[in-house]
Amino acid sequence: MQNQRIRIRLKAFDHRLIDQSTAEIVETAKRTGAQVKGPIPLPTRKERFTVLTSPHVNKDARDQYEIRTHKRLIDIVEPTDKTVDALMRLDLAAGVDVQISLG
């Protein structure tokens, strides 16, 4: 797998879960002899919602909610076959979305 690159994008609502998952991926890749670039923190997406609390009138009474989506990027340069096998066997947290691309 010479001149290959594995790019891993992680998304999660909880920053602790995503940091724990990135640490596991980086540790696994380094243990198998691959060179790792990252984790690179990407911009956090903040979605805000405003909801009227009153069912009929009184527009001044509102609640505001926010969802934050945290993202990380990891590049694994020159992965070995052991690296790919170890990453496939890796069990990550349930709240983390993983996208893997080969380049």
From Swiss-Prot:
List, alphabetically, the SMART domains matched. Answer: Ribosomal_S10 (SM01403)
One Gene Ontology cellular component term attached to this UniProt record is:
ribosome
- Gene Ontology MF terms: structural constituent of ribosome; tRNA binding
InterPro entries per the UniProt record, alphabetical: Ribosomal_uS10, Ribosomal_uS10_CS, Ribosomal_uS10_dom, Ribosomal_uS10_dom_sf
Q: What GO terms in the biological process aspect are recorded for it?
A: translation
Which keywords fit this entry according to its UniProt record? Ribonucleoprotein, Ribosomal protein
Q: Which Gene3D superfamilies match?
A: Ribosomal protein S10 domain
Q: Which PANTHER family match?
A: 30S RIBOSOMAL PROTEIN S10 FAMILY MEMBER
Q: What does this protein do?
A: Involved in the binding of tRNA to the ribosomes.
Return the similarity comment.
Answer: Belongs to the universal ribosomal protein uS10 family.
The record describes its quaternary structure and partners as: Part of the 30S ribosomal subunit.
**What name does the UniProt record give this protein?**
Small ribosomal subunit protein uS10
Tell me which species this is from. Photobacterium profundum (strain SS9)
